[in-house]
Regions:
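Surface-exposed, charge/polar-rich loops and edge strands
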Residues: 1-184
Length: 184
């Protein structure tokens, strides 16, 4: 009877979004291998998306990086990073200083896409790592201060409606765009 209840419950579900591991599943489907992925379902209103930040190593000087970024962003030095970023606003930590980066022209793209197209692709990063927002901004600062990296970018979390809208258009988000919580 439990199986029948579960089956009836699943039949009532309109849409299912694969939020974590969709790139792996896509690869498995293309390879024609039989797959049996573990699936855990959460209602969209019970999922929280955290920021998924970047730390980079670039051989460019801080001044050159600021010059490149200033072509598309208003740059303001800030004492501490903020807790609530808005779409189109990023934070950067470099040379013991936090900066607020506000996009000059409004853009409908995801912040992660804007970051990659307007900054990361231009500053010739030699190394990049992705840091979950679950660890807070202090982990970004610590990694830069350790000299393993010299720049950190803190992003506004992507909202769930954007994730669903992109999926509804049969499009994919860039890798490492979201950090879903809870994690299965």
């Amino acid at each position: 009877e439990g199986e029948k209840n579960l089956e009836n419950f699943i039949k009532k579900i309109n849409k299912i979004y694969i939020c974590d591991g969709h790139h792996r599943i896509q690869g498995m489907l293309k390879s024609n291998k039989k797959i049996s992925p573990m699936i855990i379902a959460f209602p969209h209103n019970q999922i929280k998306i955290l920021d998924y930040n970047r730390v980079l190593k670039s051989n460019l000087s801080s001044e050159k990086i600021i010059s490149i970024i200033s072509k598309n962003f208003k740059i303001k030095k800030i004492k501490n990073n903020s807790k609530n970023l808005k779409k189109g606003v990023l934070e950067m930590y470099m040379s013991n200083q936090w900066y607020l980066l506000k996009l000059i022209k409004k853009n409908k793209k995801l912040d992660v896409t804007i970051l990659h197209e307007n900054i990361i692709s231009k500053i010739k990063a030699t190394k990049i790592d992705f840091i979950s927002g679950i660890n807070g901004s202090s982990s970004l600062k610590k990694l830069v201060n350790s000299k393993k990296f010299n720049i950190a970018f803190k992003l506004c979390p992507t909202n769930i409606s954007s994730v669903m809208s992109i999926a509804d258009k049969n499009k994919f988000m860039p890798p490492k765009s979201t950090w879903f919580h809870p994690k299965p």
